[in-house]
Structure formats: C-alpha cells, structure tokens
Swiss-Prot record:
Signal peptide: 1-22
Active-site residues, record numbering mapped to chain: E152, E279
Binding residues annotated for substrate, in chain numbering: H53, K76, W78, K87, H114, N151, H235, E279, S326, W331
EC number(s) stated in the UniProt entry for this protein: 3.2.1.178
Family, as annotated: Belongs to the glycosyl hydrolase 86 family.
Catalysed reaction, written as an equation: Hydrolysis of beta-D-galactopyranose-(1->4)-alpha-L-galactopyranose-6-sulfate linkages in porphyran
Pfam families (alphabetical): BPA_C (PF18040), CBM_4_9 (PF02018), Porphyrn_cat_1 (PF18206)
Protein's recorded name: Beta-porphyranase A
UniProt organism field: Phocaeicola plebeius (strain DSM 17135 / JCM 12973 / CCUG 54634 / M2)
Taxonomic superkingdom: Bacteria
C-alpha cells in the first residue's frame, strides 16, 4: 500500500451554481460494492429481529407461518416459580425435582414469569429461590436459551399483596435476579447453555426526576445484579406501557435509552453486555380494553418498523428482539371477554365460540412479516443525509434489498444515489407498508422498470426495494466500531466545559460521528459547542424522530457527524459546552466507520474544505453553498486541492465526480506517482450544466492520483460528489 494524492485545479467565479447534490434534500447513497460490518458482524441475523411471542411451533397454523415467513419463537410465561407454586401452593416453598442426568437441549426463546405474590414476596429466601431455578432447569430435558425471571417487575413494586413496597421491593426483586443468575451460571449443566437477562424495564424513562429514575432502577439493577446477568433487557413502546405519558420512544429517545445502558455497562464491566429487547411496539389507547380490532390493533406495526431500524444497527450487541405480536392467544377468547381475540394476536378465529372447530386466519399484522420476507444477506454501505429517514441495505449474492423508514411527521422525497448510477441493477420491486391511522394497514408490491431516481415516503410508511444486481462481489469493506467514554451522566452548567475521554481509537479513511445523548428541559438548548480534540464541529438542528415538545424533558440522542481526520489513533477527547444550564449529558459514544481500502474523504464537501489541502499561489479555492444547501468546491486560476489517499497496487480504481465548467475550461484528471512522475490523464468538459464523469485506471506501486481542473484564470469550474473506489 502507498500514499496517493488528489489535486483539483480550476478557475473561480463568485456566482453560486445550482448543485446536483443538495444537503437540504434527503439523499440516500448506496454502495452495494462495499460490505458493511458492525464490529465483526455483516450478515443479517433474522433470528434476532423477526420473532413472535409464542413457543407453539407444534401448532399446525403457527408452524406454517413460522416457516413461510422465516420467523422465530420469542417468549413464554412459564418457569420454575410457576411450576413450584402449582405444586406447593406457597410462595418460597419449592418441590423436589425428579433427577434427570441426560443431555439438556436448548430452545431459542425467552422464558419469563409474572411478578405475582405467588412467585416473589417480602421475606423470601432469595438464595433458596436462586438455587431452585438451577435445580429446576438442570433436571429438565429442554431449557430456554434465555430466562428473564420477572416481567416488568418494577412497575408492580407497589402492588397490593406485597408485604414489602416501593424501593425496598425493587431491591428485593433485584437480589432475586442476582441469585438466579449466580446459581444458573454456577451449575455446570446450565452454564454456557442458558442466559439470564433482566430486568425487563417497562418504562425506561431514565431522565425522570433529574435521572433519579435511572439511579433507582436500571443503575441499581446493574450495580446489584449486573455481574450475574448475561445481558440487560428493556421494553420499548410508543405510547403508554403500564405507566407514564403518551409519548414516542421510537427515534432519538430509544437511541438515548439504549446508549445509556451500553455506556454504563462499559464503565461498570469494561465491556458492553448485550441487550435483549423482549418487547417492542406501539400501544394504542383509543380502546378501553385489550380486545382485538381490525384498525386499532394493527397501528403498532409502524412502531415495529421504527424501532427495528434502531435495533438493526445494534446486531453486534443484541441477543434478541421481539415485536409484541402473539400467536392465537386462545386464553383471551372466553365468554368473560365476549369471545374476542387479544389485541396483540396474529391469528383470528372464524368461529371464536368453538375453538376446536374453527379456521384461523392471519390478520393484517402479517404484512410486517411480508414486508421483510426473504430479506437477508450481507450489509452494504448505505447513508442517509436526514436522520428521520432511517435506512438499511443488504445484498444476498445477486439480490439487493434497500429499506427506508420515515420517522418524520411530514411526507418526504428521498433521492437515491449510487456511484454507478444503478447501471447494473434491474428487476426492481417496491414493497410498501403504510399504517393509516383510520383505515389500517395499506400494503402493496409494485414492479418498477428501474431503480427510481427519487421516492416519496409518508409518515408511518416503510419501503423495501428488492432488485437484482449483476455485481455480486464486494470490492471494499467499511467497519463500524463504537468507542465508549469513562464518563457519563454529567450535569450541565452554563458555560462550563464537559470533557469525555476516549481511548484505543483506530482512525483511518471513512466516517465518524458523535452519539450525544442529553436529558434536559425541552425548552433548553440542544446545540452545544462540541470540540473534537480541540477543533469545533457543527452540531445539527435535526435528530431522529419528533421534537418531544409534548414532554417536559427532552431525552434523546443527537448524532453529530464530523471529519474522521480529526481523530487520532489512541487517546482522543471530546469537550462540549452549553450556553445554558440544566439537565445532563447522559452518554457520549464515538462511532467510527473505517474503510479497509482507503477512499477519498469529504467528497461532497459537507465539512467545508476539511481533508482537502489547497494548492497554488495564483488562484482561490473555497466551498460555496447555494440557497438549497448544496455544497460544491469552487476553484480559480492556477490553484487546486490535494488529498492523500491510500491505494493498493494491482487493483482497478474508478474516479467519478460531478462537474460543471464555463468557457473553454476543461477538467483534467491526472494520476501521478510523485516520486517517478508517471502520469495518467483524462480530460472532461461540461459547459453550463453538471455532468457525471468517471474513468477507470490500474494502480501501480507508489502511484499518486491527481485531479486537475483547467488552469484558465478567467473561467469557472465546480466539482462535487468525488468518489474513488476499487472495482475488483
């Protein structure tokens, strides 16, 4: 590998051209020749996302659905404490298990139990309770992969019947968890087979009470039981789950919720323990009960998709996630419930008063699974200029999947870009799922002749584009790593700088961003001065999801992109300063995405001239922005721009850019070895209008790349969207 350089030289004018790449537009860029990794993981693991709350794979209808849609089992309410109470009818008293010394099989689902007085009570011996769970499972032929001992326990800490109430009851519940984890891990027949997770937080409003809720719930749980847990479980809902206010967690709030757990896990244990999202979705409060309705019961599907995009970015640190969809839920279809189905049910009976003689049909929740049916493969590099447009992309051999989700409250137009202009993409199918609040789910599949230049997407709509692609091989990789600070939950004082150190950073060619999570009054500033190793960077005015104006406290993650060249290998520091006081910075995480084969940096000039070195004594170089927010490089006279690039010898590279020229100006692109003078040259011109230009060349040892625009002093040229990538 050798160092290469790019130069851009041209003429300059004060006129601002209409750009073809507009920062004010929703730009989604897909590079399906670059494989994307989350740490060491690239392939989509469907078993972590597409599950239902059922273990009834032996049911004919359920089994067919699981097979047809590639869906897994999720969660079941049954475990050692339900079994014990059925035998002894006394909480804290456990029966003698029949010894079993045969092989233990593991089934992938979560076993959990209700926080009832039959299972836990003040005064119980938590060590005996933990020992019983290990005895129960070690003498079972089949065990669940995950055990979440109590479902949403803390919101029931004041329930009638408990002899201990409030925080004392929550601490007892945590010690109950810790004992279970300790005894299961210490049992040689279970250790390595079962994972204990908790605490199944129903209401993860960490910011409440100036983060007292965090300190007395999840932090307390991690401090007292975290060492015995394999992972931490949280429930994510839009709407009200048991308690709280009717707000949206999808978007920046859920990002901040999970980032805080990860950040403290790193501080406490030196590594991040995995997450389990054992329930997620949306809760509709328009009905007084939990009975099924064709309209209100399917509104949760938009939330399924909103949260799913968040969780897909966490696969490397995720055990499992389960949208809140059950199977037939026959337990709910009783005379007491007027023979209605459960709101979360996926199957509806034609003859509810005689379940032994009925036909079951899938309701419209099936379209969530239809939308994602057969989506699989390796992640590919995809970016969105608007955080409200969530994106994912995968390639499975010659099949490409591009997924878009709209978190915004308004319709959006998304422009789809690809460095090859989609030339090797064909047979495009557009899958669309839209949740109409008053009419239910509208699902369509449409064949389109080619990849659309732009696509419209309304609120609560998710689109999956499925296409054939002839270039099935990957020519580059981009690896995303997260780095966690030793500091978190720092109070904000007006004008006082907060410092967050990071160690072990590996920088390079690629992208970088700061995941800044804050909890402060909704009227307070969300735009501090942020410095990366002493250099100030721009903080955006937009973040994922809504503005949280219906909350007293804004709690959300704001992603701050910056030039990766501001990072150093090794130790780095982030400093932030707010102009006003109040609230906390809850977590700060550095996200670095690094190419294995180096590429040009800041080819869209979104960060001004950063990463580019101006050249020449007889001209001027600058970046100008038009009224629509389009950034382009403007170069005058005998001047230019240079950027060093790492390239590999023996590979074919493609240089591409969008160029506009005036007068007799020509774009001259030179590939030059600075030590030997070896030169490869191409010339292009595009008077008056932007034109996409490109060429391929073979790299040799110590070759240097130079891009030069004409040296005429009285003409003008603009350049944007510069890309240099290997093709083999």
């Amino acid at each position: 590998m050798s160092y290469k350089y790019i130069f851009l030289l041209s003429a300059f004018t004060l006129g601002v051209p209409p750009g073809i790449y507009c920062q004010g537009r929703n730009e989604v860029v897909v590079d399906y020749n670059t494989r994307r990794f989350l740490s060491g993981v690239s392939e989509l693991d469907r078993s972590k996302y597409f599950n239902i709350h059922s273990t009834s794979d032996d049911d004919k209808d359920v089994g067919k659905f699981l097979a047809d849609y590639q869906v897994g089992l999720g969660r079941k309410f049954w475990g050692p404490y339900s079994y014990a109470y059925n035998k002894t009818h006394e909480v804290g008293k456990y029966p003698q298990m029949k010894p079993y010394s045969g092989n233990i099989s593991v089934k992938r689902y979560i076993a959990t139990e209700h926080p009832y007085v039959q299972h836990i009570q003040g005064g119980i011996d938590v060590q005996a309770a933990g020992a019983w769970s290990a005895e129960y499972y070690s003498n079972s032929e089949l065990v669940p992969e995950f055990f979440e001992p109590l479902n949403e326990p803390f919101v029931h800490a004041n329930d009638a019947g408990f002899t201990v109430q409030g925080q004392a009851m929550r601490e007892l519940m945590v010690d109950f968890y810790a004992s279970i984890g300790k005894h299961i891990h210490n049992n040689p027949r279970l250790n390595g087979k079962m994972k204990v997770i908790g605490y199944a937080a129903a209401y993860p409003a960490w910011e409440d009470g100036n983060f007292n809720y965090w300190n007395t719930r999840m932090k307390m749980f991690i401090d007292r039981a975290g060492a015995y847990m394999d992972g931490f479980s949280v429930h994510l809902y839009d709407g009200i789950n048991v308690t709280g206010t009717d707000t949206k967690r999808s978007g920046s709030n859920s990002e901040a919720v999970l980032d805080m757990v990860e950040a403290y896990s790193y501080i406490k244990f030196g590594h991040v323990k995995p997450l389990a999202i054992s329930e997620f979705g949306g809760i509709d409060n328009s009905k007084p009960d939990d009975s099924y309705d064709d309209i209100s019961s399917v509104r949760s599907v938009s939330s399924f998709n909103h949260f799913l995009f968040n969780l897909m970015e966490r696969q490397d640190n995720l055990f499992i996630s389960i949208p809140f969809v059950s199977d037939k839920a026959e337990w709910h279809i009783t005379a007491a419930n007027n023979y209605t189905s459960y709101s979360a049910a996926l199957f509806i009976p034609d003859n509810p008063q005689n379940l032994k003689n009925t036909t079951w049909r899938l309701n419209d929740k099936k379209y969530f699974f239809e939308l994602w049916k057969n989506v699989k493969g390796e992640r590919v590099d995809i970016t969105s200029s608007n955080p409200d447009i969530q994106v994912q992309a995968f390639k499975d051999g010659g099949r490409l999947y591009i997924a878009l989700d709209n978190l915004d409250d308004n319709p959006q137009t998304v422009y789809l870009n690809n460095k090859n202009s989609w030339k090797d993409v064909s047979n495009v199918t557009k899958r669309s799922l839209y949740v109409n609040y008053n009419a239910g789910i509208e699902y369509t599949e449409q064949n389109v002749p080619s990849m659309p230049e732009s696509i419209s997407i309304v609120p609560n709509q998710t689109i999956v584009l499925v296409a054939d692609v002839s270039s099935s091989a990957f020519t580059n990789s981009i690896i995303r790593n997260k780095y966690y600070s030793s500091e978190y939950l720092k109070p904000i004082s007006a004008g006082s700088s907060l410092s967050f150190p990071f160690t072990g950073i590996e920088s390079g060619s690629g992208r970088a961003s700061l995941r800044m999570s804050i909890g402060r009054p909704v009227s307070a500033s969300k735009k501090p001065v942020v410095k990366i190793n002493g250099t100030a960077v721009s903080v955006p005015d937009n973040w994922k999801g809504y503005g949280q104006s219906n909350r007293n406290i804004f709690f959300g993650m704001i992603e701050v992109p910056f030039d990766i060249q501001l990072l150093k290998n090794g130790d780095n520091n982030v400093d932030i300063t707010f102009s006003d006081g109040g609230g906390h910075v809850s977590s700060m995480i550095l996200q670095v995405e690094k190419y294995t084969v180096s590429t040009l940096q800041n080819g869209t000039f979104s960060e001004g001239l950063s990463a580019w070195q101006p050249l020449g004594n007889y001209g001027t170089v600058c970046v100008q922005t038009d009224n629509a927010g389009n950034n382009v490089a403007c170069i005058s006279g005998h001047a230019g721009l240079m950027q060093r690039v790492d390239m590999e010898s023996g590979r074919t590279y493609r240089f591409s850019a969008d160029v506009k020229t005036e007068g007799a100006c020509k774009l001259k692109v030179m590939l030059q070895d600075m030590s030997t003078g070896t030169v490869y040259t191409e010339e292009f011109s595009s008077p008056g209008n932007y034109k996409a230009v490109s060429f391929d060349f073979n790299s040799t040892v110590k070759k240097v790349v130079c891009a030069i625009v004409c040296e005429r002093q009285n003409d003008a040229a603009w350049i944007d969207n510069i890309v240099l990538l290997p093709q083999n």
